[in-house]
């Protein structure tokens, strides 16, 4: 628990036990396995955000290139969990593991 602040982190599952991998700049890596046979294929990955702090987090958003983001909530209370759906377009014939790079942004003031 982070006392006196909001602290939002991204997780693989609803139980929020395993945090997504981060690089040194604070961007999250989301690895997904892809096989695309259609001309274009939309891949949707669901991840979860949890506020581990004691204060409310406002304007929670994911920033990245070539991705559409749907967020269940834009504000997270203390210990609240919300899902985030990330959609990316996959070209035909793309196989293997695809990495989505995204950055989590939020504010502690409304």
Where are these regions (language model features)?
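Terminal connector regions
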Residues: 3-6, 92-110
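Beta-sheet-dominated interaction scaffolds and their linkers
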Residues: 5-52, 73
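Solvent-exposed strand-loop boundary residues in beta-sheet-rich modules
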Residues: 14, 66, 108-110
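Short acidic, flexible loop segments centered on an aromatic residue
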Residues: 52-68, 103-106
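Short, solvent-exposed loop/turn segments enriched in Ser/Thr/Gly
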Residues: 39-46, 82-84, 94-102
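Intrinsically disordered, low-complexity Pro/Gly/Ser/Thr-rich segments with frequent PxxP/GP/PP motifs
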Residues: 68-95
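A cross-taxa feature marking solvent-exposed loop/turn segments within ectodomains of secreted
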Residues: 3, 42, 55-57, 69, ...
């Amino acid at each position: 628990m982070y006392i006196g602040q909001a602290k939002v982190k991204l997780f693989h599952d609803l139980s929020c036990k395993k945090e997504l991998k981060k690089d040194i700049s604070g961007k999250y890596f989301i690895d997904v396995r892809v096989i695309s046979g259609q001309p274009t294929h939309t891949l949707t990955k669901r991840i979860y955000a949890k506020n581990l702090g004691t204060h409310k987090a406002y304007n929670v958003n994911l920033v990245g290139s070539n991705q559409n983001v749907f967020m269940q909530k834009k504000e997270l209370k203390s210990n609240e969990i919300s899902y985030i759906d990330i959609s990316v377009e996959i070209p035909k014939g793309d196989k293997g593991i695809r990495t989505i790079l995204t950055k989590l942004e939020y504010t502690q003031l409304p």
